[in-house]
């Protein structure tokens, strides 16, 4: 992979300082073990490395071969990257003999270079092959999936992952369109969707929700998010931080519900004769919910929908922290 080609697509890391600040890399924690589950173009990872102590370590993940090529430019013995999904966190840690980490950062969604590179097939704004895979070395492309999937399944994906109210009409149009000719380009799909959607949302292309839905499905984004949240929690040391940046409501809902399930423990009836020490205890503490500043949104409009949630693992009652 040509690194110069990687760098031609500019990317601004969203909530850069805020996310790394949330990991609390100070004092003894600076020499801890950290995970960047989504290396991307390395904005968060590079800032984490700047703040890590001499004995600190950072393990990053990414499915995108361009991201892996970019990571190869980092010459730092404290850094390693895995070319795989962050959902393989437990396996990667076990292979390295690591039981606990002090912080996990997940910057979800799709990066600007992926969107802006027409050859990746993520965007309807420029014509390109209908691919949409984060990892182009494995799995099936969006074009391959649309060529064979049932109308009912296509509708379900667009409705659930795109929250698209015209999912029925769009799926029907896709199946009718592929009967005439294979749907192999982003422009073809965008035009089919535009013809099927009779009304318009102000400031939003009619293909936006459909492209989001198919991308999420092809890359199993929500399923992998649920896996990594549980794996991250399991490996967090006491007072370890989980920092997650989401870019749409489906992701944020999963993150919010997961953190709430660990922080808000149902309590039994107070009238029952249960000792305080035997009451269910919260496993995490909610630290923050942060949105980008007006200044950041002005400089980078793609940050507008970002939401960052931070939670900290609590020590087990009675255990040394």
Curated annotation (Swiss-Prot):
Belongs to the methyltransferase superfamily. RsmH family. Its EC number is 2.1.1.199. One of its GO terms (cellular component) is cytoplasm. The keyword S-adenosyl-L-methionine applies. Gene3D superfamilies: Putative methyltransferase TM0872, insert domain, Vaccinia Virus protein VP39. Keywords: Cytoplasm, Methyltransferase, rRNA processing, S-adenosyl-L-methionine, Transferase. One of its GO terms (molecular function) is rRNA (cytosine-N4-)-methyltransferase activity. NCBIfam families: 16S rRNA (cytosine(1402)-N(4))-methyltransferase RsmH. Specifically methylates the N4 position of cytidine in position 1402 (C1402) of 16S rRNA. Transmembrane segments: none annotated. This is Ribosomal RNA small subunit methyltransferase H. It comes from Herminiimonas arsenicoxydans. The gene is rsmH. S-adenosyl-L-methionine binds at residues 42-44, 62, 86, 107, 114.
